Amino acid sequence: MDKIEELKIEELKIEIPQRKTKFFHDSENSDKRDEEETLNPTITSKAKILIKSKNFWIETLIFVISVFGALCVAFGIMLIGFLLWLVSNTISILYFIKQKQYPLSLQQMVFLITTCIGVYNNV
């Protein structure tokens, strides 16, 4: 029987560099801020930036108007519900065109046309 040789593998030490966030500059307080973010993960720095963006508020406005429109239709307030939905859909179309999200704008246009045809045929 052949002699079995043992292979010794040296331990590999891989150091992963600490990633500094781009929101804090190197200062005495940066470690303290990093610790605070770690201890309080409810609102991260990315979430703070998202909330401050104009797109966030436009998308939230579209969402709120369309939900209120849907609730109005669900509870039988048809005219107000349809008008709220129409406003929301129009804002969506314009917003998606501005953001160059053409498939979504086309989808909203098709929804607008089919809904208007449905309202016309059922009134």
Swiss-Prot record:
GO molecular function: nicotinamide riboside transmembrane transporter activity
Electron transport is among the record's keywords: no
Protein's cellular compartments: Membrane
Classification via Pfam families: NMN_transporter
GO cellular component: membrane
InterPro entries cross-referenced by the UniProt entry: NMN_transpt_PnuC (IPR006419)
Protein's recorded name: Transmembrane protein 049L
